Amino acid sequence: MSRVAKAPVNIPAGVEVKLNGQLLTVKGKNGELSREIHNAVEVNQDANALTFVPRTGVANADAQAGTARALVNAMVIGVTEGFTKKLQLVGVGYRAQMKGNVVALSLGYSHPIEHTLPAGVTGECPSQTEIVLKSADKQLIGQVAADIRAYRRPEPYKGKGVRYSDEVVRTKEAKKK
């Protein structure tokens, strides 16, 4: 059995968990998240904990149990604390600003880029070179941050581009004559 799946997911006070067949719904102060759990995994709900048991006779049940536990744990953390992703814009003239739920980016192209944030993700720009994204859904916020970063990934010679705030960009040395 997966080591990750052996640990139960603790349900803190103020979080409501509903299990309807294989559909798990987690509700908390930051919203409500739902996820379909793989058929190879059996979910047991106690008073304040969820346990994930792989079904016997299914090939990848152990792996699916560990994955399901990790995803549900992220859901519980998301509805209680939420997730934050910070992006930095490095480069001359690179700017960002929020217009409602649209991030307007100026990244050195001939046109401005407008990225609409999906429902469930909020954004703010504390400065012109910073973007802070917040959401209860870990997968969604990671995808939105990756989409924004993909407009101008950090290049390896000067390090210009959109990067995560904790990302370390390894720069190369320029070609010598």
Curated annotation (Swiss-Prot):
Record's keyword terms, sorted: Ribonucleoprotein, Ribosomal protein, RNA-binding, rRNA-binding
One biological process term in Gene Ontology: cytoplasmic translation
Entry GO terms, CC: cytosolic large ribosomal subunit
GO MF annotation terms: rRNA binding; structural constituent of ribosome
Function as written in the Swiss-Prot or TrEMBL entry: This protein binds to the 23S rRNA, and is important in its secondary structure. It is located near the subunit interface in the base of the L7/L12 stalk, and near the tRNA binding site of the peptidyltransferase center.
Family, similarity comment: Belongs to the universal ribosomal protein uL6 family.
Designated name of the protein: Large ribosomal subunit protein uL6
Gene from which the chain derives: rplF
